[in-house]
């Protein structure tokens, strides 16, 4: 494949000024930022550059290293689907194709810098192309899982005022059914070999697009992406991240938690709709010049998963605890993993038993990390440090992680409280910028001089953090964040339901699952409970993303409530977890 490279490197220089040093590009003394520079910025040893663009300042630099022989012959992206199809792109090929994709977005799609683009695609190579193309053009990338329903998509398009949606055939019918209710939406771009009435065809436009494209010089704190994050009340919030928070903020994660080099091949199992895909399948991995490996499976299968680890030279694996719980039930000693050396997990608490079984069968440690959509990785178990089974590890640079009480006072070790990040004079650049159009929720994350995560935990005498529970009642099942309000809202639409309360319930495979406590309407109180349970579960699957449906249902006469009438979910949750 012919690749056209930029003739001119994007470079920076330090300029001393009375107000403090900053980066400036208008000088013949420019020099490209290096990994050491990015690490120094993360440690607050150097200021954030005024301008930064991940495509130009990271990906294109790896293209140049690749061309000059300074990088191993390792793909930038390696995609397979188990059916014989395979895609391998070098950084140079990724650069060329993403420039063509950038021209598709700006010319036939008519998008301009700052426009928001909803992207609902499965794990296909085009997801990465669109992602990088948005970086090159200064568009705001908004990913979503293909499990989103019509109602979910409608909310996201209306709330974000998206100008464009990029989607696959699985999603196109749902989009067409609500497009008349989305006045901001101007363009529908289909990623498919087939044509669809009213949609532009990405593959067709990509073939004819020019490889010549000048990358937009974006500001470091300019919006780059928006992630919809679930909460316990109201609709999902829009957490906005900047070019710098994502593009530079995951440098230390790539080195110290993922332990990546440019020779590594990283397989991150996260769905494309979540920020974990950005962490492990874009920023942390490509900052280190490593290869992103992707296997698109129609559905998760332990045998296919293990065969993949055996067949391909994957060095680094990151997946939800649910996957490891399923894997340790197999005889792993039968498998010979070619190069696997580093295994990670996150997204929900990991059972100590699974960690121990994984090590016993594979000889490999399992390094757990804890983070949030808003601020990235907060705690992690890292190589070179002792692992305490069940612990989330220690706080990571640049964060000062503390346990605080409701008044913002730091609690001593061994005392349960809220997990919080102590702030200095300035808000860390690796934080999310804001909840879009929701200043109250944004402000509510700060208590005195702390960012409060909404999660509860304990720090031991050695500085290790232990997860206790979510203060905001969000359920994490198989790595998916599920807001109880969304499930309750779906249930209440069914005529059998008077009211409901949704909480987490322990599950040996998924860690926790959604459980609904339901008060029935009078006409349904004598119904067949088994049939009604199945009917309600199907109702939720059809009303919202299927992974949110309650796997457990209990019918009750009444729900526990406070004196003001608020449902006491904590009582029900404690009952489920045996802590009542």
Swiss-Prot record:
<keyword id="KW-0276">Fatty acid metabolism</keyword>
<dbReference type="GO" id="GO:0006637">
    <property type="term" value="P:acyl-CoA metabolic process"/>
</dbReference>
<feature type="binding site">
    <location>
        <position position="566"/>
    </location>
    <ligand>
        <name>ATP</name>
    </ligand>
</feature>
<dbReference type="GO" id="GO:0005524">
    <property type="term" value="F:ATP binding"/>
</dbReference>
<keyword id="KW-0547">Nucleotide-binding</keyword>
<comment type="similarity">
    <text>Belongs to the ATP-dependent AMP-binding enzyme family.</text>
</comment>
<keyword id="KW-0496">Mitochondrion</keyword>
<protein>
    <recommendedName>
        <fullName>Acyl-coenzyme A synthetase ACSM4, mitochondrial</fullName>
        <ecNumber>6.2.1.2</ecNumber>
    </recommendedName>
</protein>
<feature type="binding site">
    <location>
        <position position="470"/>
    </location>
    <ligand>
        <name>ATP</name>
    </ligand>
</feature>
<keyword id="KW-0809">Transit peptide</keyword>
<dbReference type="GO" id="GO:0005739">
    <property type="term" value="C:mitochondrion"/>
</dbReference>
<dbReference type="InterPro" id="IPR042099">
    <property type="entry name" value="ANL_N_sf"/>
</dbReference>
<keyword id="KW-0479">Metal-binding</keyword>
<keyword id="KW-0067">ATP-binding</keyword>
<dbReference type="Pfam" id="PF13193">
    <property type="entry name" value="AMP-binding_C"/>
</dbReference>
<dbReference type="GO" id="GO:0046872">
    <property type="term" value="F:metal ion binding"/>
</dbReference>
<dbReference type="GO" id="GO:0006631">
    <property type="term" value="P:fatty acid metabolic process"/>
</dbReference>
<keyword id="KW-0443">Lipid metabolism</keyword>
<dbReference type="GO" id="GO:0102391">
    <property type="term" value="F:decanoate-CoA ligase activity"/>
</dbReference>
<dbReference type="Pfam" id="PF00501">
    <property type="entry name" value="AMP-binding"/>
</dbReference>
<feature type="binding site">
    <location>
        <position position="455"/>
    </location>
    <ligand>
        <name>ATP</name>
    </ligand>
</feature>
<feature type="transit peptide" description="Mitochondrion">
    <location>
        <begin position="1"/>
        <end position="22"/>
    </location>
</feature>
<keyword id="KW-0460">Magnesium</keyword>
<dbReference type="InterPro" id="IPR000873">
    <property type="entry name" value="AMP-dep_synth/lig_dom"/>
</dbReference>
<keyword id="KW-0436">Ligase</keyword>
<dbReference type="InterPro" id="IPR045851">
    <property type="entry name" value="AMP-bd_C_sf"/>
</dbReference>
<dbReference type="InterPro" id="IPR020845">
    <property type="entry name" value="AMP-binding_CS"/>
</dbReference>
<dbReference type="InterPro" id="IPR051087">
    <property type="entry name" value="Mitochondrial_ACSM"/>
</dbReference>
<dbReference type="GO" id="GO:0015645">
    <property type="term" value="F:fatty acid ligase activity"/>
</dbReference>
<dbReference type="InterPro" id="IPR025110">
    <property type="entry name" value="AMP-bd_C"/>
</dbReference>
<dbReference type="GO" id="GO:0004321">
    <property type="term" value="F:fatty-acyl-CoA synthase activity"/>
</dbReference>
<feature type="binding site">
    <location>
        <begin position="229"/>
        <end position="237"/>
    </location>
    <ligand>
        <name>ATP</name>
    </ligand>
</feature>
<comment type="function">
    <text>Catalyzes the activation of fatty acids by CoA to produce an acyl-CoA, the first step in fatty acid metabolism. Capable of activating medium-chain fatty acids with a preference for C6-12 fatty acids.</text>
</comment>
<feature type="binding site">
    <location>
        <begin position="368"/>
        <end position="373"/>
    </location>
    <ligand>
        <name>ATP</name>
    </ligand>
</feature>
């Amino acid at each position: 494949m012919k690749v056209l490279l930029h003739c001119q490197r994007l470079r920076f220089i330090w300029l001393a000024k009375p107000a403090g040093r900053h980066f400036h590009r208008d000088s013949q003394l420019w020099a490209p930022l290096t990994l050491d520079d990015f690490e120094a910025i993360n440690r607050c040893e150097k200021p954030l550059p005024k301008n930064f663009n991940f495509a130009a300042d990271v990906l294109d630099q790896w293209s140049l290293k690749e061309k000059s022989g300074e990088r191993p012959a390792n793909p930038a992206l390696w995609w397979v689907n188990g059916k014989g199809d395979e895609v391998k792109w070098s950084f140079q090929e990724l650069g060329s194709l993403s420039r063509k994709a950038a021209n598709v977005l700006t010319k036939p799609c008519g998008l301009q810098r700052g426009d928001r683009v909803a992207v609902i695609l499965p794990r296909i190579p085009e997801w990465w192309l669109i992602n990088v193309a948005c970086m090159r053009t200064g568009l705001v990338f908004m990913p979503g899982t293909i499990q989103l329903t019509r109602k979910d998509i409608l909310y996201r398009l209306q709330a974000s005022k998206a100008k464009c949606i990029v989607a696959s055939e699985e999603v196109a019918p749902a989009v067409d059914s609500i497009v008349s209710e989305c006045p901001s939406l101007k363009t529908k771009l289909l990623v498919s070999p087939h044509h669809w009435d009213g949609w532009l065809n990405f593959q067709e436009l990509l073939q004819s697009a020019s490889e010549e494209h000048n990358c937009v010089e974006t500001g470091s704190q300019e919006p780059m992406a928006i992630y919809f994050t679930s909460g316990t009340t109201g609709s999902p919030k829009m957490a906005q991240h900047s070019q710098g928070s994502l593009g530079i903020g995951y440098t230390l994660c790539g080195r110290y938690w993922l332990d990546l080099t440019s020779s590594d091949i990283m397989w991150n199992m996260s769905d494309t709709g979540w920020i974990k895909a950005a962490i492990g399948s874009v920023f942390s991995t490509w900052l280190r010049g490593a290869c992103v490996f992707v296997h698109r499976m129609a559905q998760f299968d332990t045998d296919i998963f293990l065969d993949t680890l055996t067949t391909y030279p994957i060095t680094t694996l990151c997946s939800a605890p649910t996957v490891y719980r399923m894997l340790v039930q197999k005889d792993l000693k039968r498998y010979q993993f070619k190069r696997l050396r580093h295994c990670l997990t996150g997204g929900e608490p990991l059972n100590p038993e699974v960690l121990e079984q994984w090590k016993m069968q594979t000889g490999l440690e399992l390094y757990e990390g804890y983070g949030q959509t808003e601020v990235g990785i907060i705690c992690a178990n890292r190589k070179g440090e002792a692992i305490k089974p069940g612990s989330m590890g220690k706080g990571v640079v640049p964060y000062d992680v503390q346990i605080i009480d409701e008044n913002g006072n730091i609690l001593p070790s061994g005392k349960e409280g809220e997990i919080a990040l102590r702030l200095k004079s300035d808000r860390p650049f690796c934080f999310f910028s804001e909840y879009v159009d929701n200043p109250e929720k944004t402000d509510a994350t700060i208590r005195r001089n702390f960012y409060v995560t909404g999660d509860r935990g304990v720090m031991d005498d050695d500085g290790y953090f232990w997860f206790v529970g979510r203060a905001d009642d969000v359920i994490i099942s198989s790595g998916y964040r599920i807001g109880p309000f969304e499930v309750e809202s779906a249930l209440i639409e069914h005529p059998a339901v008077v009211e409901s309360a949704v909480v987490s319930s322990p599950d040996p495979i998924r860690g926790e699952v959604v459980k609904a406590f339901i008060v029935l309407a009078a006409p349904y109180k004598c119904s067949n409970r088994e049939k009604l349970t199945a009917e309600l579960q199907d109702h939720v699957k059809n009303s919202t993303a299927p992974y949110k449906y309650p796997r457990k249902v209990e019918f009750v006469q009444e729900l526990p409530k406070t004196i003001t009438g608020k449902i006491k979910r904590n009582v029900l949750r404690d009952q489920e977890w045996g802590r009542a």
